[in-house]
Design a protein with these regions (language model features):
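Radical SAM [4Fe-4S] cluster-binding motif and immediate context
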Residues: 59, 225, 233-414, 421, ...
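Catalytic cores of alpha/beta
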Residues: 166-170, 357, 418-432
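N-terminal [4Fe-4S]-dependent radical SAM core
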Residues: 2-33, 39-51, 94, 208-262
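C-terminal accessory regions of radical SAM enzymes
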Residues: 2, 34, 39-54, 206-219, ...
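Proline-aspartate-enriched helix->loop->beta-strand connector
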Residues: 120-124, 307, 436
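Short catalytic helix/loop segments, enriched in acidic residues and glycine
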Residues: 51-69
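Glycine-rich beta-alpha loop elements in corrinoid/cobalamin-binding modules
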Residues: 63, 70, 79-87, 97-224, ...
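TPR/TPR-like alpha-solenoid helical repeat scaffolds
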Residues: 595-609
Length: 609
């Protein structure tokens, strides 16, 4: 790893070096700026059948929309290119699988080349939010330079901020990186190039000079009125995104024909969880937009794009109780007739301490909430600095039972450093006591620039600089854990090993990484599926029916467990013909897979068929 130079050391000299490089690489006047969202999943990671089932996430580039608004206010000619949307739209227009698999790379490259040649930008900005997008960020920069080597390229986003040196080291064609929130600093960067702003205002910028990484760490984060920015999506078809993928995680529970779009009401999070990169990117604390600005944006989406479902991007939606209540009340008062979900997660303790927030949320159209739980063991929760304890989660479960219209889900993580089997089992027990509608169980993926990542590097349990881009990450764009299990199944169909119940052995033992991978299916089964056998509440059963139908028919086609337990749910609801059909499907899928035969035997599920 190269030595990092931060501005505080001989700041004048370092600023001068960066400014000199800016003057050399970016010609003035610089007026036309192309903002690009690269494809989010590598070609070999895209399954066309999954894509056509709208399984991959398809969020509009919200941050680029905000940046476009701010740049246009300063007089710049801005255009947005969303290569991810354009690629997936072509999937649906040309759904011949063999044709598409051979042409994925050609499709996005052709679209990018056309845009660069037609728009003729003076500067290209690339966005990368998630670690798994690292490779495509680099390749997008490389291809852009091959079209016109004279166009300077600047990259920004959460991943770029978390792994800046690696982005610049591997991205030879990336001239500069924009660190942290670029809403203001990127605009200042362009103004400095055009001699419209003092060089001393340069902030949040990094580059490589003489093989050394140099950055200006001083932040120019948007505050007060600067936060009240409604995204300008240029010519993007915001109302169509929902047609080609997921926005949020509650498609099965919202209106069938709902058109979704994301909205951000505040930035940052009060929590300091050791596995989370929010504080590194947004800084400490939470900064909220005005209620009027947020609801104006929702109304704009409704009127201009026919959006009637909102997914909040907030990492701490319930921060500032008074403001949050006002937000929900204003949504209700304007009679916008929308629904919304909180897919990014709600802090459990914030919900139970202010029950009025849940009531107001329900009244304003909330249909789904995720809660960040992570672990059912207080020792682990303290170690990872969660702002909630087991007692809060138990109260939360009882609270949410009062709002059956809201589909409740919980985030759970396995594999924290030195986490024992007993502590993982505590998470299983807590999930049963809380009795949320469903839980997402994931293996820990330490993100660069987080406290837990640094801890694990120092302990030698992971290698420093590893980006872990195999799709297992805790990100909106990653393939879900259930799909990771499908990949594992394909790899092990012929030699699936015996599946052991590790919780019958020494619970004080820390499982190995390979054991954790194998353990995931068992934990997911014990947390989500096993309790269905004892569930008789018709409201819960109706929720499970909707969810498991979506899992079985769209999310993970060929999954015998989801079909079996959907059959059990259908039996309890008195739909015996459908129940028999689902169980027959489960038998069919099991017969085709040694992997599933072994696991059904180990879980004693064959007797349920």
């Amino acid at each position: 790893m190269t030595k990092t130079n931060i501005l505080s050391d001989n700041c004048v000299l370092k600023r001068k070096k960066i400014i000199d490089k800016m003057r050399d690489r970016i010609k003035s006047p610089c007026k036309k700026i192309l903002l690009v969202q690269p494809v989010q999943i590598t070609e070999d990671g895209i399954d066309i059948k999954i894509a056509l089932n709208k399984r991959y996430y398809m969020y509009p580039p919200y941050s680029l929309g905000v940046l476009t608004t701010n740049l246009k206010k300063r007089g710049y000619d801005v255009s947005i290119l969303d290569l991810n949307f354009d690629l997936f739209k072509i999937f649906f227009e040309n759904s011949t699988e063999s044709f598409l698999n051979d042409r994925i790379t050609d499709i996005w490259k052709k679209r990018l080349e056309e845009k660069i040649k037609n728009f003729e930008p003076d500067l290209i900005g690339l966005s990368c939010t998630f670690t798994m997008g690292h490779d495509l960020l680099i390749r997008t920069a490389d291809f852009s330079k091959s079209i016109n080597p004279k166009i300077p390229i600047i990259a920004g986003g959460v991943h770029v901020t978390n792994a800046p040196e690696m982005v610049l080291k591997e991205g030879k064609n990336i001239d500069f990186i924009s660190l942290y929130e670029g809403d203001i600093s990127f605009c200042d960067f362009a103004d400095i190039v055009n001699n419209k702003k003092s060089e001393e205002t340069l902030s949040q910028i990094g580059t490589r000079i003489d093989k050394q990484y140099i950055r200006i760490d001083k932040r120019t984060a948007p505050a007060s009125e600067e936060l009240n920015t409604i995204p300008d999506y240029d010519n993007l078809s915001i109302g169509e995104y929902n047609n080609f993928g997921e926005i949020g995680t509650f498609r099965y529970w919202r209106n069938k024909d709902a058109i979704g779009s994301p909205v951000l009401s505040n930035k940052g999070c009060r929590a300091r969880c050791t596995f989370c990169s929010v504080a590194n990117f947004n800084g400490s604390g939470v900064r909220g937009r005005s209620v009027k600005s947020v609801v104006d944006e929702i109304q704009h989406l409704k009127e201009d794009y026919n959006v009637d479902h909102i997914t909040w991007l907030d990492d701490d939606l319930f921060y500032n109780t008074k403001r949050t209540l006002s937000l929900f009340e204003e949504i209700s008062n304007r009679k916008l007739d929308i629904t919304w979900d909180a897919s990014n997660g709600i802090i459990g303790s914030a919900a139970v301490m202010h029950e009025e927030l849940i009531h107001a949320a329900s009244e304003s159209g909330c249909i789904g909430m995720y809660f960040g739980i992570e672990s059912g063991n207080d020792q682990i929760l303290r170690k990872i600095k969660k702002p909630s304890a087991v007692k809060h989660f138990l109260k939360l479960g009882k609270l949410m039972d009062k709002y059956p219209n809201i589909f409740t889900r919980g985030f759970l993580i396995m594999g924290f450093p030195n986490e024992t089997l007993g502590q993982i089992y505590d998470t299983i027990k807590l999930s049963h006591e809380m009795n949320l509608d469903w839980y997402t169980v994931q293996l820990l993926t330490p993100l660069p620039s987080t406290a837990i990542y640094n801890e694990m590097v120092e302990a030698g349990t992971i290698e420093g600089g590893s980006l872990n881009i195999d799709g297992e990450g805790f990100t909106m764009f990653s393939v879900r854990e259930s799909e990771r299990q499908r990949r594992k199944e394909r790899q092990q169909k012929t030699n699936a090993k015996e599946f052991h119940n590790m919780f019958k052995n020494n619970l004080d033992r820390v499982p190995t990484k390979s054991e954790l991978t194998e353990l995931w299916l068992l934990v997911d089964y014990l947390i989500n599926y096993q309790r269905i056998i004892e569930t008789n509440d018709r409201v819960k059963l109706k929720k499970l029916q909707r969810f498991l139908t979506d899992v079985s028919d769209r999310m993970t086609i060929g999954n015998p467990i989801s079909n079996l337990f959907l059959g059990i749910v259908e039996t309890k609801l008195g739909r015996n013909i459908e129940a028999d059909r689902r169980k027959l499907l489960a038998k069919e899928y099991i017969s085709e897979s040694k992997y599933w035969q072994t696991r059904f035997d180990s879980l004693n599920l064959m007797e349920l068929l």
